[in-house]
Amino acid sequence: MAENFFLYYEEMDWNDHIKRAGYQIWLEPKALIYHKESVSVGRVSGLKEYFMNRNRLLFIRRNAPSALTIMVFYNYFIFVVTPRNMINYIRKGHKGFSALLLKAIWWNLTHDKNSTDLGYPLN
């Protein structure tokens, strides 16, 4: 499992790499999993917003089937998702979240897709 995701999208990245390696993904329909959302970082936190946005872009960079897919996704993210999120941050009074979103985008523009530099202080 790639260590450069840290919080979000690591299992999706792992899943895509497993499938590309020729393995099958199976489902156990009787399995029951309990997942308490946002226990480790909180429902509203800068840490969550940064890594959710950073890793969404990183996932596409690592797993998109073509450069065209990456370009289409980046355009959608920059021109639709980013303005929508910034409006929501302002509307909800989440100070500093817009800067973290821009930092997440900048990280993806300035770091290799295999970089283990998380771009966020964890201590």
Regions found by a protein language model. Name each.
Residues E37-V41, N88:
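Short acidic, glycine/proline-rich loop/turn micro-motifs
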Residues R62-N63:
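Mid-chain, well-packed structural core segment of small domains
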Residues N4, K36, F59:
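Residues that scaffold the ATP/ADP-binding catalytic core of kinase and kinase-like folds
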Residues H35, N53:
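Histidine-centered active-site/metal-ligand motif
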Residues A2-L32:
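A short, conserved alpha-helix in the catalytic core of glycosyltransferases
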Residues L47-M52, A67-N123:
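Non-catalytic, C-terminal membrane-associated alpha-helical segments of glycosyltransferases
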